[in-house]
Amino acid sequence: MQRQTVCRACARRAPLSVERWRCECGGLLDLEAGPRFDPGRVEAETWSLWRYRHVLPVGPERWRGVTLGEGCTPLVAPEPGRPDLLAKLDFLLPTLSFKDRGAAVLVTAAAELGAVGLIADSSGNAGTAIAAYAARAGIPCTVYVPATTPPSKLGQARRHGASVIAVPGSREDAAAAARQATGAPGVLYASHVWNPLFFEGTKTLAHELAEQRGWRLPERVVLPVGNGTLVLGAHLGFAELAAAGIGGRPPVIVAVQAEACAPIAAAFRSGAERVAPTENRGTVAEGIAIAAPARGDQVLEVVRASGGALVTVTDSQTRDARRRLAARGIDVEPTAAAAWAAACALPAGDGVTITVLSGAGLKSG
């Protein structure tokens, strides 16, 4: 049975469809809960995130023509003498960022729904991931990006055959341009923010972390946050594990923003329940520089419910963390380095902390 979408604002339920990416009331959509997670149904012979196919909202076979082998990334301890501080190397996914998790599931579902075109907006990584999986599925794709996006990311999406449209202004301006272009019959808005199918892919991060550690969960996870794709997906996966009685207490979520653009962290510090837009003062961690995150309130709710925190790091801390990782053979982009900087600043002795290194250094030069 096809899973239903549920509006976060008015609770209206409706089937998944190609053209419907938000509720008629304007609200954000979630996907209703799916089957119970069962370790016994993990497909051990499938070395990708599709080993968890029994909890993914796609049919039994379509994924085989879309997958690029995404998932099952290494878990390592980069800091000498800190076996409690681990890094999940999601920058080793096919297009070099964690966004491949969401893109693989979203594009597979889009193909099953009969989409004849995809529209996405991105600061780089999500657009590249959608472009790659759209190419694999044979679906035309258009990606709207801020004009300030690094050329390396634009070139990658174009090589996958996507039409890339650079929009003057901010990340939010690019998203607005993409939304204005939606509405044609059969064209799906492949937004990693608005489309709940994307979170169904990023949730597999949690499943992998548990399986890699013998179905034990870490005490903390440290995740970069801009729009919240990674935080919300990870939370969804941990919730599925908790509902199945796996791994004990879900981990505390520490979400990391750049000091120069930190609207969710500002709301957390002030005790607010709503996230107010802020100014993007410019940061090397451009992948998390989102001044008005559409799901900011949801991220705030999830982090607080986990017992976690939202923290900020300076560009100086981010650059230093990037250099230290590179000196140990791990080259990541500034957005990932920001999370590592925050993780290294946390006190030791509170159990295992896992940081997701979300994007490769090649992405930003």
Feature-to-residue mapping (PLM):
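PLP-dependent amino-acid enzyme catalytic core
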Residues: M1-G365
